A protein has these predicted regions:
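Hydrophobic, Leu/Ile/Phe/Ala-enriched alpha-helical segments that form helix-helix packing faces
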Residues: 61-69, 128, 214-225
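Glycine-rich active-site/cofactor-binding loop and its immediate structural neighborhood
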Residues: 95, 105-108
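N-terminal, charge-rich interaction modules
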Residues: 1-65
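Non-catalytic C-terminal interaction segments of nucleic acid-processing enzymes
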Residues: 1-30, 158-242
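Structural motif
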Residues: 102-104, 135
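Short, flexible loop/turn elements at secondary-structure junctions
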Residues: 97-99, 110-112, 237
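Active-site metal-binding core of divalent-cation-utilizing nuclease and nuclease-like domains
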Residues: 47-51, 60-101, 115-122
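Catalytic cores of nucleic-acid endonucleases
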Residues: 111-173, 196-212
Length: 242
């Protein structure tokens, strides 16, 4: 199941026997999860219209997971001393699948600041230590998608014949700041085509290195963040963009 994702370009990384746990204890859930993720697509027009944010992009994926009973859940933990609650803390996870063998926790990090990975991994670590979850799963932008954004968005702009701010406004892509517009105008004044100037500024602002994407997640896991929780990490490849 995971091998099929690997063969079609998805970044897949597992830690602490997660792959064996999923295959043995959650084969049906893993199969359905892989199927939903393999079929997921993101429109470049949606990416640009939405200013790079989540909006409707990953909401479709969230709805599909919810339909499969991967629901938002708030884990509540209390410390009890001599029968009296002394302290309490909660851990909210966007998608949790409860099964007979245990629970799977999943977070989608499309385009947050990269410290959100620390939050997710540390949450998984604590929940696993409490035997509340069996595996933690994170889905984010893969390496090939991250590398392809500039070329793909530039090509889309050219294909749409977009060559001015007025044409962007016509498509409803006019909610950018004055500073962003000026940066594009300055590049155009230096001779850069409008589509190229817009794409460079857009990608730098929205999908920069300080946002959630594969290399940032991989780096944290290689350093041991989240250990010893079993982890499955999935990076969406360029082919998801249409």
């Amino acid at each position: 199941m995971l091998d099929q994702l690997r063969q079609t370009g998805f970044d897949i990384l597992t830690r602490n026997h997660a792959e064996a746990i999923l295959a043995h204890d959650f084969p049906g859930d893993l199969n359905l999860l892989c199927k939903v993720i393999a079929e997921f697509r993101i429109s470049l027009e949606e990416v640009i219209r939405g200013g790079g944010g989540e909006a409707g992009l990953t909401q479709r994926l969230r709805h599909e997971l919810s339909d499969l009973n991967w629901r938002k859940h708030n884990f509540s933990v209390e410390t009890v001393v001599d029968g009296r609650a002394r302290a309490g803390i909660s851990h909210e996870v966007d998608h949790v699948k409860f099964a007979e063998a245990g629970a799977l926790a999943l977070e989608i990090e499309w385009n947050n600041k990269d410290p959100f990975f620390d939050r997710d991994l540390e949450n998984f670590q604590r929940l696993h230590a409490l035997s509340a979850i069996s595996v933690g799963i994170i889905v984010t932008r893969g390496a090939s998608m991250q590398d392809a954004f500039l070329d793909r968005i530039t090509d889309w702009m050219r294909g749409q014949g977009l060559s001015s701010e007025d044409e962007l406004d016509r498509l409803g892509i006019g909610t950018r700041t004055a500073a962003q517009r000026k940066a594009v105008a300055d590049q155009v004044a230096r001779g850069m085509p409008f589509a190229d100037a817009f794409a460079r500024k857009f990608v730098a602002d929205k999908f920069g290195q300080a946002t959630t994407h594969w290399s940032k997640l991989e780096d944290r896991v290689q350093r041991g963040v989240g250990n010893p929780c079993p982890l499955l990490l999935i990076g969406l490849p360029e082919r998801v963009l249409i």
